């Protein structure tokens, strides 16, 4: 951990902020979760929640809905925060803090942006070892709720 500004340039090194949309629909054993298959590194080919980086000056709640539209072509409504993850080593791109939002959404997803594929998957059928980053931890939370 570095304390204070960079000795060379004087700027602070702050973590990047990302947001992920956690959309669940249905009841009981029929509950489905919206996932994308990543089309780019890191974790290319693995499954993840739709999401991405918050732009400069952008509200994170707006960013999560933008990412949902870009990656799945779906509208949504932010419900609340499920989790915040930020271990410095969790992302190979550097220190990234992610806000996982519960988002109400429905419809047929159409993959776009850096998503190679998007679909609703029965929650109990999600293969945890195929999830990218630490998203399997959020799937476990959902499966146990």
Named regions from a protein language model:
Residues 74-83:
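A short coil-to-beta-strand element that immediately follows conserved catalytic motifs
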Residues 1-22, 28:
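Acidic, metal-coordinating catalytic segment for phosphate/diphosphate chemistry
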Residues 21, 81, 101-103:
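A structural signal for short, well-ordered beta-strand segments
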Residues 85-109, 142:
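Active-site-adjacent beta-strand/loop module that shapes the phosphate/pyrophosphate-binding cleft
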Residues 100-102, 110-144:
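NUDIX/MutT-family hydrolases
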Residues 30-70, 74:
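Conserved Nudix-box catalytic region and its N-terminal flanking loop in Nudix hydrolases
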């Amino acid at each position: 951990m570095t304390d204070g500004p960079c000795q060379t340039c004087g700027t602070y090194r702050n973590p990047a902020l990302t947001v992920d949309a956690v959309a669940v629909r249905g009841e009981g054993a029929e509950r489905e979760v919206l996932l994308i298959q990543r089309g780019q590194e890191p974790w290319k080919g693995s499954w993840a929640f739709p999401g991405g980086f918050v732009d400069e000056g952008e509200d994170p709640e707006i960013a999560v809905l933008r990412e949902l539209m870009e990656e799945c072509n779906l509208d949504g409504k932010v419900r609340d925060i499920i989790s915040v993850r930020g271990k410095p080593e969790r992302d190979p791109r550097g220190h990234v803090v992610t806000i996982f939002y519960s988002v109400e959404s429905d419809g047929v997803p159409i993959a776009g942006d850096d998503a190679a594929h998007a679909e609703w998957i029965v929650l109990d059928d999600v293969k945890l070892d195929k999830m990218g980053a630490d998203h399997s931890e959020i799937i476990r939370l959902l499966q146990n709720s």
